[in-house]
Amino acid sequence: INSYPAKTDMLQPLMDALAKFIFRLHDAGVLHKDLNITNILYKATADGEYKFQLIDINRMDFRSHLSMNERIENMRRLSCQPTAYAYILERYAAQAATNEQTFQLRGLIARLLFEIRQRIKSNVKMML
């Protein structure tokens, strides 16, 4: 996913499946508090589908319902190329039957703010 869009045709089915997997997690009320690409394992099956598995599950929270804002905030840690992230957001929004452009924009803003906060924290730590 980090080489997207260079391998677009090959990666789109994987990203479609990943978006669907994350959507199903969220619909079940599961929040993985460190939801990033390195904590999601996947395997292609013989029928061309993908199976996913979460690792580092000690930081999970379970709720009866997740708002769209909680879902977006949870996905902001996905550490992949911005174009791949935007595509995953679009596919997720399609699963959620919500406006894809609005969901993408909100997701991209959440990720940008998250990255800015991370850089500020890193710079402060280096100054101490």
Task: Indicate where each model-derived feature is located.
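Conserved kinase catalytic-core helix
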Residues: I1-K33, T38
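A generic structural signal for well-ordered coil/turn residues at beta-strand boundaries
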Residues: L25-H26, N36, G48-K51, N74
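Activation segment
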Residues: D34, A44, D61-R63
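Conserved protein kinase catalytic/activation segment
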Residues: N39-I55
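C-lobe/activation-segment region of protein kinase-like
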Residues: Y50-M126
